[in-house]
A protein has these predicted regions:
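Short amphipathic alpha-helical interaction patches enriched in hydrophobic/aromatic residues
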Residues: 13, 31, 49-52, 173, ...
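Conserved binding/catalytic microenvironments
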Residues: 149-159, 163-456
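Amphipathic alpha-helical scaffolds
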Residues: 31-38
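Generic anion/oxyanion-binding catalytic loop in active/binding sites
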Residues: 12-13, 34, 51, 205, ...
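Charged, solvent-exposed alpha-helical segments that act as regulatory interaction surfaces
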Residues: 36, 71-75, 327-330, 414
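Short amphipathic recognition helices of helix-turn-helix/homeodomain-type DNA-binding modules
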Residues: 1-26, 38-138, 142, 148, ...
Length: 456
């Protein structure tokens, strides 16, 4: 059968300045980030240019590749592909204007595999992220559609159940890392949470439902971040940000921006981290954000500025965080903010001084962070111990540095956390100049054994 060439696809490829081989590689890479297997080759691209049909999954990936490359939303239906009856699961390349689209995006995300695809790549291009933040900043609350016709009726009992489940998964995350529970929470969110958002409910129940749904989506995103699947985490967090617009929850929305800053900073995207942290600070102004929340936003700004080696800016942000924290009252705070205690703030400061290469301050704060961190936050304690080890190294004490790091590895053996492993490997890199010493050799062997035990 003769086919007409696909003029739309040919035009998009020309605009994006991408070859058949280049487009095929971008599609394979993006699919791999999402835990999908896609065997697209340049031969397949040519067939599609010639007018052949395509599977919806491949069409969705191709559309998102063009969206990222061109800096605007490209849907699968825009590709001109024969046999493409409908677009595949939408991805939050841009900030969804309609709530229905945001919920569709989240439903699609829950179908993606949670396996680690560790990479420094983020799913949302800078242009789309800036547009998303601006949209959130200026948006008016969507509001909830109370008492609409639906075969399902939601109540506050459902809200309490979701919050209890989410808190349980948060505890698992703190104790064992994001690798524990991510898949189960993803399925719970898909099967038990998202359907309730389309149920019938009162104004009060609807408000509470969207609030707890945003919190749950944020936890799933954070788990994906900890596993090392940064593209998936990026999209979950941005989708959670969109849910906060329903109720106008600026305090929690700003905390999601702070978490996006945390992720960008971890991946070395320093400018992006600074902008997101400042967006959190500014976005929460005029809201009901508590002093503890404001301290958290400022602490994330300090972390980003420290990575940028901006001593003046980081010092200002740390002082601001400390000033807000002094006014914190647990009775005013939402439950999701309970983790941000004195130990957490001190731990953030220890990271700041480590990145600013301030040996004395880094050591002082790292010691305090280790002493004050509750062992139930096993991953956080592991981070703090590695920062303490790095602080000893900054002060020229190799033996104490390795002894402290060794304890962190021993206590963190059960952690399924790509972030914790990254802390350890970063430390290994810092002591590599002493590779000939027996103490370094023994530590490297300990790390290798600990990593191997995770696969047993």
């Amino acid at each position: 059968m003769n086919r007409e060439p696909n003029a739309q696809l040919i035009s998009l490829m020309a605009e994006a300045e991408v070859s058949n081989k280049g487009l095929a590689k971008r599609m394979r890479d993006l699919a791999q980030q999402r835990g999908m297997e896609l065997g697209t080759t340049h031969v397949a691209i040519q067939r599609w240019r010639d007018g052949a049909g395509i599977r919806s999954q491949a069409a969705g990936v191709m559309a998102d590749v063009f969206s990222a490359k061109l800096g605007r939303r490209i849907a699968a239906g825009d590709l001109g592909l024969f046999g493409q009856a409908e677009a595949s699961t939408p991805q939050p390349v841009a900030y969804p204007a309609a709530l229905s689209e945001a919920l569709s995006v989240l439903d699609g995300l829950t179908e993606e595999q949670p396996q680690s695809t560790s990479s420094s790549e983020l799913a949302i291009p800078d242009t789309d992220l800036s547009a998303a933040v601006l949209s959130w900043m200026i948006a008016r609350p969507d509001g909830v559609q109370a008492d609409r016709p639906s075969p399902q009726r939601a109540s506050m009992r459902d809200v309490h159940a979701i919050r209890t489940a989410t808190e349980m998964f948060m505890r698992l995350d703190f104790l064992y890392g994001g690798g524990h529970g991510h898949k189960a929470l993803r399925h719970y969110f898909r099967d038990d949470v998202l359907p309730l958002l389309n149920a019938s409910y009162t104004e009060r129940v609807g408000h509470a439902l969207f609030t707890v749904a945003a919190e749950t989506a944020e936890v799933i995103g954070w788990m994906a971040y900890d596993i090392g699947n940064h593209a998936l985490a990026n999209r979950y967090l941005l989708s959670a940000l969109r849910l906060t617009q329903v109720t106008g929850d600026r305090m929690f929305g700003a905390s999601i921006l702070a978490n996006l800053s945390h992720q960008a900073n971890y991946l070395g995207h320093t400018s992006r981290a600074v902008q997101l942290a400042r967006s959190a600070v500014e976005g929460a102004k005029g809201s009901s954000a508590t002093p503890r929340a404001k301290a958290m936003y400022a602490a994330h700004e300090a972390r980003a500025l420290s990575s940028a080696h901006d001593l003046t800016g980081a010092s200002r942000a740390m002082n601001e965080a400390e000033r807000h924290f002094e006014k914190a009252d647990a009775a005013e705070d939402p439950e999701w903010l309970a983790y941000f205690n004195e130990a957490e703030l001190i731990g953030e400061f220890s990271h700041c001084f480590r990145d600013l290469k301030r040996p004395v301050e880094s050591l002082r704060f790292a010691k305090q962070a280790v002493a004050k961190t509750d062992p139930q936050y096993a991953r956080t304690l592991g981070f703090c111990r590695i920062v303490l080890a790095q602080s000893h190294l900054l002060n020229g004490d190799l033996d104490r540095a390795i002894g402290t790091a060794s304890q962190a590895v021993e206590e963190g053996e059960s952690l399924q956390s790509a972030r914790f492993l990254r802390y350890v490997t970063d430390f290994q890199g810092e002591i590599s100049t002493h590779a000939g010493l027996p103490v370094v050799t023994r530590f490297n062997e300990q790390v290798a054994e600990a990593v191997a035990s995770l696969d047993e």
